[in-house]
Curated annotation (Swiss-Prot):
Name used for this protein in its record: Large ribosomal subunit protein bL27
Alphabetical list of PROSITE patterns matching this protein: RIBOSOMAL_L27
InterPro entries xref list: Ribosomal_bL27, Ribosomal_bL27_CS
Keyword NADP recorded: no
Coiled-coil residue windows: none
HAMAP family in UniProt: Ribosomal_bL27 (MF_00539)
Family according to the record: Belongs to the bacterial ribosomal protein bL27 family.
Alphabetical UniProt keywords: Ribonucleoprotein, Ribosomal protein
Gene Ontology MF term list: structural constituent of ribosome
Record NCBIfam families: L27
GO terms, biological process: translation
Organism: Trichormus variabilis (strain ATCC 29413 / PCC 7937)
Gene name of this polypeptide: rpmA
GO cellular component, one term: cytosolic large ribosomal subunit
Length: 93
């Protein structure tokens, strides 16, 4: 038998790099237009007011303002950005 099995398995030892997904700007944080708000696979969070969506489902701010996380129906979550002046009204009501 010419098989060598004494050094352990060499078929393991690989792993892929992390995708670094998740929320990048949280509720109440000030953002500028173009800031990435959420990196995601699929639409766990939906785009709300003043938020764009990229081809990989990344949500980003379209205007300068403050981030708010809101509910859209029972189960949907949406992310909106309100200009600084309007943000106080949106958070209050």
């Amino acid at each position: 038998m010419a098989h060598k099995k004494g050094t352990g398995s060499t078929r393991n030892g690989r792993d892929s790099n992390a995708q670094r997904l998740g929320v990048k700007r949280f509720g109440g944080q000030a953002v500028i237009a173009g800031n990435i708000l959420v990196r995601q696979r699929g639409t766990k969070f939906h785009a709300g007011n003043n938020v764009g969506i990229g081809k990989d489902d990344t949500l980003f701010a379209l205007v300068d303002g403050v981030v708010t996380f809101e509910r859209k129906g029972k189960s949907r979550k949406k992310v909106s950005v309100y200009p600084a002046a309007a943000a106080a009204e949106a958070v209050a009501g």
